Amino acid sequence: MPTKLERAEQNVETRSESLKKPLGLFDLVLTQILFVVGSSWVGAAAKLGQAHLFFWLLAILLFYIPQAAVVIYLSNRMPLEGGIYQWAKLGFNEFAGFIVAWNLWLLSITVIALGGMFITTNISYAIGPGAAWMPDSKWCVALISAALVGGLGWACVRGLSLGKWVHNIGAFAMFVVYAALIFLPLLGLARGELKTYQPLQLALPTMSIFYCFNIFSKLSVGALSGFEYVAILAGETRAPARDIGRSVLIASPVIALMFILGTSSVLAFVGNSPIDLIGPVPQTLRLGLQSFPIAGAVAAIGILLMTTRTIASTSVHVTGSSRLPMVAGWDRLLPNWFSRLHPRYKTPVNSIIFVGATTLLIAIASQIGAGIQEAFQLVDNAANVFYGIVYFTMFAIPIFGAGAIRSGASIWLRIVAICGAAVSLSAIFFTIYPIIDVPSRLSFAVKIIAVTGIANAIGVAIFLVGRKRRRG
């Protein structure tokens, strides 16, 4: 006789049978790399100087490896559509599953809403000084945001048979940029423009311990995160129990090398000069190729390729954030409207429309007035708290979860899960209590706590209403 856990898993698998399954191992690997690797973090890490390698290695040891290990374990144990929603629901209870999915959904909504602003900025950089007005133009940002959300929403409705190629092309564009970035110091050495280049030089940090922990938590939960997101699409993967874990194993070392060597390249050319934290990659490309007549053109191409990556990465957010309401609808915690599939493409079309409308409304509203802009900035700052909550819950499953799930977790997996949970808590703390200059640390902390509390109170209210409606 099947256990309660097995019946719950079978119910999700039965629901997932209606979904198309276009994702293979190749697609998953590229999506993992696309989603995790960004361009801004190599600039942030380069500000640490030669100590960047120390921080990268520490973050890899205490967060990146634990994250990969736990995601592999849970995706093998529960290869279910909805990913971490199902893991927390079956590992703890429905409330935990809903709240962790709610926090992840809030994070994605924030990222999608910001996408238009980032793309507008990148396009203005690619065009040159004549387009410097674009990021400051509310109408321009609003129009580009509308085009982004509309285009990605259409692709998402069409399904991952199309969407996976958006993600694959974005990953390829990023590979081209990072290959150029990593190769640049070698070219500089060959031409005599760089005297030395030591990409793997290990130096201990000289800044305060408090500052070190802050940077470490940011690199961990900010840069080296995202493996759990692809698992949301398990029901649309041909062999999820096998391939999601494999994709993490294959992508992990590639991602680590891209971050470490990319940071080394930025440091080699920018050095002690001010680092452009928005566009450290094009800044480095310009400096590395300044002796070539085509330096400006190459940098512009690099910016456009990174813009392609941003669009593709935002597409992953749209896809994942539309699946979370769908699976909550399966459990009748949200109206069944969110779970209805497109008759041809078998995608949650209503959920996609809801995500698109919500993010577009936020993106446009954030351009209207200073009060709304400040509120959105607070939500953006609180996004790290949302992600910290997601990761703390995920790491807790092999430690404190249901016996049927944690029974297969080895001692070493539980130890690394404890490390990951501790880092997640530190990321929450350093988001609430920043070491950067703010007018009032207490006021900043109170605002972040208030935003996080209100956001999660809304999530709790939605859960309670959904459960009451289901019982009635």
Model-derived segments and spans:
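TM-loop-TM module centered on a large, flexible mid-protein loop between adjacent transmembrane helices
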Residues: 86-88, 93, 125-130, 247-315, ...
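Select transmembrane alpha-helical segments in multipass membrane proteins
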Residues: 21-32, 93-106, 144-148, 206-220, ...
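Helix-loop-helix connectors at the membrane interface of multi-pass transporters/channels
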Residues: 4, 15, 86-89, 116-143, ...
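A generic transmembrane alpha-helix motif of multi-pass inner-membrane proteins
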Residues: 56, 377, 382-387, 411-472
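Hydrophobic transmembrane alpha-helices that form the core helical bundles
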Residues: 46-48, 65-149, 154-157, 307-324, ...
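Membrane-interface loop-to-helix entry segments
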Residues: 140-194, 225, 248-253, 384-393, ...
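Helix-loop-helix junctions that connect adjacent transmembrane segments
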Residues: 19, 53-54, 131-140, 168-300, ...
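Membrane-interface "cap" regions at the ends of multi-pass membrane proteins
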Residues: 1-58, 64-69, 78-81, 460, ...
